[in-house]
Amino acid sequence: MVTIRLARGGAKKRPFYQVVVTDSRNARDGRFIERVGFYNPLATGNAEELRLDVDRVEHWVAQGATVSERVAGLIKSAKKSA
């Protein structure tokens, strides 16, 4: 099953997340099909906190991909700010 979820990156105590489309059986930070955005929870100043390609997310959902709870909230906030 294809899912859209967060893959953690960054350093210790400094998380940075990629929003990825992946097979649900793959490891959290493992192989993915497509990167559709990022989320930086520690963004300060002019740093961008969230970038999401909503068109690609909607494409994958139309293809049957499931969305994690956290990513669903990020999609909602991305649509609201756009």
Curated annotation (Swiss-Prot):
Protein's UniProt name: Small ribosomal subunit protein bS16
GO cellular component: cytoplasm; small ribosomal subunit
UniProt GO molecular function: structural constituent of ribosome
Pfam assignment, any one: Ribosomal_S16
GO annotation, biological process: translation
Disulfide cross-links: none
Source taxonomy: Bacteria, Pseudomonadati, Pseudomonadota, Gammaproteobacteria, Enterobacterales
Keywords assigned: Ribonucleoprotein, Ribosomal protein
Gene: rpsP
InterPro entries referenced in this protein's UniProt entry, alphabetically: Ribosomal_bS16, Ribosomal_bS16_CS, Ribosomal_bS16_dom_sf
Similarity comment: Belongs to the bacterial ribosomal protein bS16 family.
